Structures are given as structure tokens and as C-alpha cells.
Design a protein with these regions (language model features):
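Glycine-centered loop/turn motifs
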Residues: 1-7, 117, 205-213
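Catalytic P-loop NTP-binding/switch module of NTPases
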Residues: 1-42, 99
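Surface-exposed loop/turn and secondary-structure junction residues enriched for glycine/proline
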Residues: 7-9, 44, 125, 133, ...
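Generic structural motif
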Residues: 12-19, 66, 192-195
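Noncatalytic linker/hinge segments flanking ATPase motor cores
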Residues: 25-28, 110-112, 173-181
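Intrinsically disordered, low-complexity, polar/charged repeat-rich segments
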Residues: 29-32, 36, 40-45, 131, ...
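Carbohydrate-recognition loop of C-type lectin domains
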Residues: 42-172
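An aromatic-glycine-centered, glycine-rich loop/turn in mixed alpha/beta architecture
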Residues: 147-219
């Protein structure tokens, strides 16, 4: 959409926002601050350990989650796999921003936040599209047209919850039972049967994959 500058910019005639490269972030809420404070007693960060990399990465604007991989390509190598602040796949711009902060040339010379001798590589996850098929029974006065937006919102919220928890899990699993429960929570839905994910059962992802919702087919 159109962008209106707050202050006068010489030579600017029009500006449009085409896509988001790095998401803005809301102020930290009280519960998040409390959890972060409690976690600070469980692990101690010092230069170059996993906790230090974790905390410094999350301190960079636009980063929502990170997994730190030590010695991923031999001694002295570190990989930071990140999500953006809405827990999606990071853009190239965000990856480059984090890379410049830690180790601009990936050579371990200590030109960024990483200690000398730590060659850091920043990467992001792969997205796995999950297509869903389900047969849904509706209550009197409801049908697909009236329930479809709420159904797909409920499924999206489940997927968003999985992505938000990615940092804390060794791998994510998209479960039929959880999708059925999300659908059943929609007003007007009385039953859901025969649910499949990508034509089969639960979808088990690798450690560095996150799910995104594909096509929902209604039986």
C-alpha cells in the first residue's frame, strides 16, 4: 500500500510498501519478561557459549527464535538458525543483518559479536506446506460457507502455535488430532472425520523445518 513519510523527503514523489523484509515488534509484555527473568537463573551466558549466542541473537530486532548449532562444520564453527519476529522463515535481509552483527565475513576474525576463532553462519528454516482434507458435519443453520473462514483461522492458529514453539522442540509434528480439535472448536461444527495431511497421517518435520498451511479440501 501507499506509504506517507512522517517528515519531508526531498525528491520523493510516491512510495509503496510491497513486502515486509523485517517485521516490527511489540513491546515485551509482562509475562514474557517474567519468563525471561526466571530463565536467566537457569543458564549462565558468557562469551561464546550457546546461551550467549542465544541471548544476543534474540536481542537483534526482527529475530523471534534461534537454535544454536555448535561445531556444525568442524571445530570453531557455529550456525545460528533463526525465525523472524512472527515465527516465520527469515528473509535474506534479516539473515544478512544477523550475519553482519556476529561475523560479517564468516571467517572467525572477531569483527562482530562472535569471539575470535568462532566462524559463524546464519541461516533460517525450510517451510513445509501441509495440505489438509477433512469431512465436516455442520449444525442446523450452518454450512461450509458460514464456517470456512473460522475453520481456516483455527487451523492457522494451531500452525502458528507450532512455529512459536519451534525453538523449544527438537522437531515439530503436525497432528491430525490437534487439527480435528481446532476444527471442532468452531461454532457450527458438530463433527469432523477422515482428516488427512498431505494425503496421509501426521506430518513429522525435521529439526530445521516449520509447517505452513497449504490447501484445505472439504469433503
Amino acid at each position: 500500500g501507499d506509504v506517507i513519510p512522517v517528515e519531508y523527503v526531498m525528491g520523493l514523489t510516491t512510495a509503496k510498501l510491497t513486502r515486509v523484509l523485517i517485521y516490527g515488534e511489540d513491546d515485551e509484555d509482562t509475562e514474557t519478561l517474567r519468563l525471561r527473568y526466571q530463565e536467566s537463573f537457569n543458564e549462565r551466558a558468557f562469551a561464546g557459549n550457546a546461551k550467549d549466542y542465544h541471548d544476543k541473537t534474540l536481542g537483534i530486532a526482527g529475530v523471534g527464535a534461534v537454535k544454536v548449532i555448535r561445531a556444525w562444520n568442524g571445530p570453531g564453527t557455529v550456525k545460528l538458525v533463526i525465525l523472524d519476529s512472527v515465527f516465520g522463515k527469515a528473509t535474506d535481509v534479516l539473515i544478512q543483518t544477523v550475519q553482519k552483527e556476529f561475523d560479517p565475513n564468516k571467517d572467525g576474525h572477531g569483527d562482530g559479536l562472535a569471539p575470535i576463532g568462532h566462524a559463524v553462519t546464519v541461516d533460517t528454516v525450510s517451510e513445509v506446506t501441509v495440505n489438509i482434507a477433512a469431512t465436516i458435519t455442520y449444525d442446523n443453520g450452518y454450512d461450509l460457507n458460514t464456517c470456512k473462514p473460522q475453520i481456516e483461522t483455527a487451523i492457522e492458529e494451531y500452525f502458528a502455535g507450532l512455529r512459536k514453539n519451534w525453538e523449544n522442540q527438537s522437531k515439530l509434528v503436525v497432528r491430525i488430532a490437534s487439527i480435528d480439535a481446532a476444527i471442532m472448536g468452531v461454532k457450527g461444527v458438530v463433527d469432523v472425520t477422515g482428516t488427512t495431511l498431505n494425503g496421509g497421517g501426521n506430518v513429522e518435520l525435521t529439526e530445521y523445518e516449520i509447517p505452513v498451511l497449504g490447501v484445505v479440501t472439504y469433503g
